[in-house]
């Protein structure tokens, strides 16, 4: 379903959630990160998703992160609020809060662990869209959710009022191409996979929900601008520069490496909550090398 929010394009950072040494959310650091991203050209800020450690923040923290992000952005860039849950009622409650505080859109992941059927997925997302009038971006990430959203299910959901796009995080470009070919006009197709995002955008995709943008926001913005304009030469110049980061930011489970990287660049603290554990020394060395190779150190 088309919506003005489907016009969100470009670099959408999947923002980390800064935490203090005791594991509490560092809200002042979150505000500073948002200001920095806006200054660096990030086009949209996504909060409390996978990279934002949504599985390990409680409901009160989840809501407060959304509220603070909206308040700090102050309309300068859109806020994409992670509101996903594997309980439909909980997802509706989170989405109601996001709408109340002024988020621009919601990101809704395929329900994880309980493995709904395609019909279950359809009814889940449709129920949320009908309950809360806040533009929804679907999020397909079978590597984490286990359940996979089939192509035909996406097309069914694209007809539901309020569902405006999808974050396609399988890394399978052929799947994205079919969606770009067959989805209704105005339905946005975003990459959720940094290594293949440039290819998706060159095929007609609308942007990249990016982990790499946490530490290289200006370069990711420039890559998205070039790719969406069809400037393959410039897009690939930037892509080749960022490749070491795309690889090594996933050397362990996200967000472990990117939390280390933001701390290394002194953007915010790198504390993680269990069951996430710190990056191993061997992988620290690999990511340090990638930061140098990409010109960030």
Swiss-Prot record:
Q: Site (Part of a proton relay during catalysis): which residue positions?
A: 50, 113
Q: Which residues form the active site?
A: 139, 167
Q: Name one GO cellular component term.
A: cytosol
What CDD domains does UniProt report for this protein, alphabetically? DHDPS
Q: Which reaction does it catalyse?
A: L-aspartate 4-semialdehyde + pyruvate = (2S,4S)-4-hydroxy-2,3,4,5-tetrahydrodipicolinate + H2O + H(+)
Q: Name one GO molecular function term.
A: 4-hydroxy-tetrahydrodipicolinate synthase activity
* Pathway(s) this gene product operates in, as recorded in its UniProt entry: Amino-acid biosynthesis; L-lysine biosynthesis via DAP pathway; (S)-tetrahydrodipicolinate from L-aspartate: step 3/4
Q: Which UniProt keywords apply?
A: Amino-acid biosynthesis, Cytoplasm, Diaminopimelate biosynthesis, Lyase, Lysine biosynthesis, Schiff base
What's one GO BP annotation on this UniProt entry?
Answer: lysine biosynthetic process via diaminopimelate
Q: Where in the cell is it found?
A: Cytoplasm
Q: What is its main location?
A: cytoplasm
Per its UniProt entry, which superkingdom is the organism in?
A: Bacteria
Q: Which residues are pyruvate-binding?
A: 51, 209
Check the record and name the Pfam families matching this protein: DHDPS (PF00701)
Q: What is its EC number?
A: 4.3.3.7
InterPro entries, per the entry: Aldolase_TIM, DapA, DapA-like, Schiff_base-form_aldolases_AS
Task: Write out the function statement from the record.
Answer: Catalyzes the condensation of (S)-aspartate-beta-semialdehyde [(S)-ASA] and pyruvate to 4-hydroxy-tetrahydrodipicolinate (HTPA).
Q: How does it assemble?
A: Homotetramer; dimer of dimers.
Q: PANTHER family attached here?
A: 4-HYDROXY-2-OXOGLUTARATE ALDOLASE, MITOCHONDRIAL (PTHR12128:SF66), DIHYDRODIPICOLINATE SYNTHASE (PTHR12128)
Q: Which family does it belong to?
A: Belongs to the DapA family.
Listed name of the protein: 4-hydroxy-tetrahydrodipicolinate synthase
Q: Which organism is it from?
A: Albidiferax ferrireducens (strain ATCC BAA-621 / DSM 15236 / T118)
Gene that specifies this protein: dapA
């Amino acid at each position: 379903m088309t919506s003005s929010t489907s016009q969100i394009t470009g670099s959408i950072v999947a923002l980390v959630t800064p935490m203090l040494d005791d594991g509490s959310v560092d809200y002042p650091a979150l505000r500073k990160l948002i200001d920095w991203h806006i200054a660096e050209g990030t086009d949209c800020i996504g909060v409390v998703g996978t990279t934002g450690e949504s599985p390990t923040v409680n409901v009160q923290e989840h809501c407060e992160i959304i509220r603070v992000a909206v308040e700090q952005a102050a309309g300068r860039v859109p806020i994409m609020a992670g509101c996903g849950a594997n309980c439909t009622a909980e997802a509706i409650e989170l989405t109601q809060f996001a709408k109340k505080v002024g988020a621009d859109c919601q990101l809704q992941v395929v329900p994880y662990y309980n493995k709904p059927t395609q019909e279950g997925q359809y009814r889940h997302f449709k129920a949320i869209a009908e309950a809360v009038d806040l533009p929804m971006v679907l999020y397909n990430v079978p590597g984490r959710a286990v359940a996979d959203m089939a192509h035909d299910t996406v097309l069914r959901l694209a007809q539901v009022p309020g569902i405006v796009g999808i974050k396609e995080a399988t890394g399978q470009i052929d799947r994205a191409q079919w969606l770009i070919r067959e989805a209704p006009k105005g339905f946005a197709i975003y990459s959720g996979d940094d290594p293949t995002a440039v290819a998706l955008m060159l095929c007609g995709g609308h942007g990249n929900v990016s982990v790499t943008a946490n530490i290289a926001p200006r370069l990711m913005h420039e890559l998205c601008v070039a790719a969406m304009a069809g400037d393959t030469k410039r897009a690939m110049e930037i892509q080749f520069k960022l490749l070491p980061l795309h690889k090594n930011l996933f050397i362990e489970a996200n967000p472990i490496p990117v939390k280390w990287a933001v701390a290394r660049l002194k953007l915010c603290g790198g504390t993680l909550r269990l069951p996430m554990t710190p990056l191993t020394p061997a992988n620290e060395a690999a990511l340090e090398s990638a930061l140098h190779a990409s010109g960030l150190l």
